[in-house]
Amino acid sequence: MPFWKAGKNDDQVLDELKEMQKQNADEFVKKQEHADEAQKSSLIIDNNFTPVEYDPQYILQVNHLKKYFPIKGGMVSKTVGYVKAVDGVTFNLKRGTTMGLVGESGCGKTTTGRTILRLYDSKSGGQVLFNGQEVYDLSHKELRALRTKMQIIFQDPFSSLSPRMPVGEIIGEAVREHNLVPKAEFDDYIDQVMDNCGLQPFHKDRYPHEFSGGQRQRICIARALALNPEFIVCDEP
């Protein structure tokens, strides 16, 4: 409906504007009601799974995992819907094995990995058991200890490396933070990790921008392996 038409007086135009505002308000209310119903439905669905018991042969048990991202809309940016990035993923991973998660771009592979590692504050449903522990039930202190056992190699090596830190510090930061190696052995340990990943010891003093894309990915791999983790998520490394 146009704001102005020839031959109409101010009162007529004002009436049309009021009618438009009323229609917009009614539409917003309907969207909000729909969002509220969708949220209630999702909560019912999220609770509709059977918890699994810990099986020692599996290092990781993922049961009906969900991760939804809210869609904001309206004048007050309320939730009007959800993007279901991960919706009911279930699998078990035995110790010492490798599993590939295959799918088209945007299907939720990266989000699945990040949700398993609890790189998000919360999940939308399901279970993530690592060595029998529900990852999302851990305290901050317990989660910090778990970080040494679960690592990720990010898809984009450039954005995941600090441009202000030399490579040696990037690889050894977590090792030093968790006191995994005695100080006297620290430098030799980092040299060995770098050598295992095809990097030279003299690379320690260089910065990420001085390396090629392939070399930067080696740095990311070395950073993950330096902690000697039990489980690694490789996001298309």
Regions flagged by a language model, labelled:
Residues I232-D235:
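Catalytic Walker B motif of ABC-type/P-loop ATPase nucleotide-binding domains
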Residues I221:
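Hydrophobic anchor residue at the start of the ABC signature
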Residues E134, E185-F202:
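Conserved ABC ATPase "signature" region
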Residues Y207-F211, Q215:
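Conserved ABC ATPase signature
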Residues V76-T79, V135-Q151, E177:
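ABC ATPase NBD coupling module
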